Amino acid sequence: MVSAASNIDVSNESIIKMEGVDVVFGRNRVLRRIDLNLAQGETLAIIGESGCGKTVLLKTIIGLLHPTRGSVYFDGRDLGRMSEKELNGQRIRFGFLFQQAALFDSMTVAQNIGFSLRQHTNKRAEEIREIVSARVAEVGLPENVLGKKPAELSGGMRKRVGLARALALEPEIMLYDEPTTGLDPIMSDVINELIINTRRQHPVTSIVVTHDMRTARKVADRVIMLFPLSRLKSGEPQIIYDGPAERIDDAADSRVSQFIRGEARERLMEMRRINGR
Amino acid sequence: MRGGPVGAMVDWVADWISDFGAVLLDWTASLGSIAIFVMRTFRWLLGRLPKKETLTPNFYEIGVLSLPVVALTGTFIGMVLVVQSYVQFRNMNIEAKLGAVINMSLVRELGPVLAATMLAGRVGSAMAAELGTMRVTEQIDALITMGANPIHYLVVPRFLACLLLIPSLTIMADFMGVAGAFFYAVYLLDIDMYHYLENSRHFVGGFDLFVGLFKSLFFGAAIALIACYRGFNCEPGAEGVGKAATAAFVHSFVVILVLDLLLGIALDGIYYTIWPEAPKLL
């Protein structure tokens, strides 16, 4: 199978599998019976409106949140059955770009990017410096940012440093949480290009959580759309679209076309109906 | 909703029982959560020590940077004690005994409690705010995704720094308090130096110093655990961080005072078991 977004081979082997995953916080159910398969080398975009559970899904995949019911398998192994040590061992096979980059405030850019290398490898300081410089160049940042603290950087720069940090250990899976949120259109496109380049340079499987259709179309092979549980009828599946990125415009479900066209009128009417106005 | 005054009373009692039950459940859940947090900290502490580059900044921040403020407050507490006690002692013509009472109070009680209070105020609330901010801005999640355990990386170094350095801070508070009291009593109030020192030497022993230092270890551990727990369980937003910092100080201070009382009673018991002939205070 060849990826539509980047002409890269996608294996048919599943690397991440979710089976009947429910996530409940107190009385608030966020995810219901999620079944998902991700093939090795594939880039999946998860779209949906704010609050539908996209980030929760991403955090469940890496074991930051635990499913209330169901299982998440990574490479055929159930994350729920792993000890904390085993889970940490698996996590270093992932790279995670957080929505606000989540850089460590107390460290410089160089220390942030080199953090995993210092924690999990026996590389000498000189080797770590070289890798850090290479990663910074890869995300298109100048060398002089290395000594700066995250607070001194712009939003776009922070995202790129976050990406460089996530790539430091050459992960097998990259998880992007709203990579273009809060950025101007040009910087958003820079980040999209970086996601595509990352895939070209490293053989990674990626999941991109976004509500930016431009990003989803540009970087993903496949798109799934989540729908908020509060607006679903009982028994309706939460994933209302699962298919190739280039065919999302032809989706039969009107809720998908409403979302991708950014149509607010029907949503506003629904909100008014719910609020009794 | 029932009608009549009896019905209203029944409703009020039912509400009260329900609210009380909810508070009790919350407290039990919090206690369980704190216990798990403490156990995980000790498990990591006994399992693998953090790297030197993680420990050093915490030791510097918590120990070295706290020294000046502890020294300053210690000096003033010593002098204030002399000012407050002098008139009463002079009225009884026993002002030369002032050294014994003040130094005993400083070494056994005020030195460790003062050092711990300053640590809780200066370091505890800052730790809670820092970790709270890290929680809110997903930095703790980032640590986890990078395969680092946040308890091992963030809590254990702070716990070790508080535990191992609070005795030094207590010694500093003791020393500066004793020196401040001596200076005020001897040079400003003209109390006879020989008798002041002789009474101090006679009444204050090694066990008193040990009591103060031993208690301080518990205070340091409590401050670090409470502050880190509050930071880790911070509510979202700037308000959550502020609340975590305040709660860290208030809870630490209450726990310091409770521990002070309990340890004071226990250590007195040990003292009179070892030396049954020693004169009793009461």
PLM regions and their residue ranges:
Chain A
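Conserved ABC ATPase "signature" region
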Residues: 77-78, 125-144
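Conserved ABC transporter NBD signature motif
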Residues: 70-78
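Conserved ABC ATPase signature
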Residues: 149-153, 157
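Short coil-to-helix segment of the ABC ATPase nucleotide-binding domain corresponding to the Q-loop/switch region
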Residues: 106-115
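Catalytic Walker B motif of ABC-type/P-loop ATPase nucleotide-binding domains
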Residues: 174-177
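Helix-to-loop junction immediately C-terminal to a conserved catalytic motif
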Residues: 62
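Conserved catalytic motifs of ABC-family nucleotide-binding domains
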Residues: 170
